[in-house]
UniProtKB/Swiss-Prot annotation:
Function of the protein: May have both metalloproteinase and lectin activities. Induces local hemorrhage in the skin of rats. Degrades type-IV collagen, gelatin, laminin and fibronectin. Has hemagglutinating activity on red blood cells.
Protein name, per record: Jararafibrase-3
Gene Ontology MF, one: toxin activity
Alphabetical keyword list: Calcium, Hemagglutinin, Hemorrhagic toxin, Hemostasis impairing toxin, Hydrolase, Lectin, Secreted, Toxin
Class of the enzyme per the UniProt entry, highest EC level: hydrolase
Highest classification ranks of the organism: Eukaryota, Metazoa, Chordata, Craniata, Vertebrata
Length: 43
């Protein structure tokens, strides 16, 4: 499957870097609302 536009595929998952500053809790909620089942990644 092709990744969504502007998303990076890695090990069967997709990642996107956002440049808007958010608190961790708010960023996690943003990810969950963006698509159910998705979560904020940490590196």
């Amino acid at each position: 499957x092709n990744p969504p536009q502007d998303w990076l595929p890695m090990n069967g998952l997709y990642y996107k870097i956002f440049d808007e500053l958010k608190a961790w809790k708010d960023a996690e909620m943003f990810c969950r609302k963006y698509k159910p089942g998705w979560h904020l990644a940490s590196f």
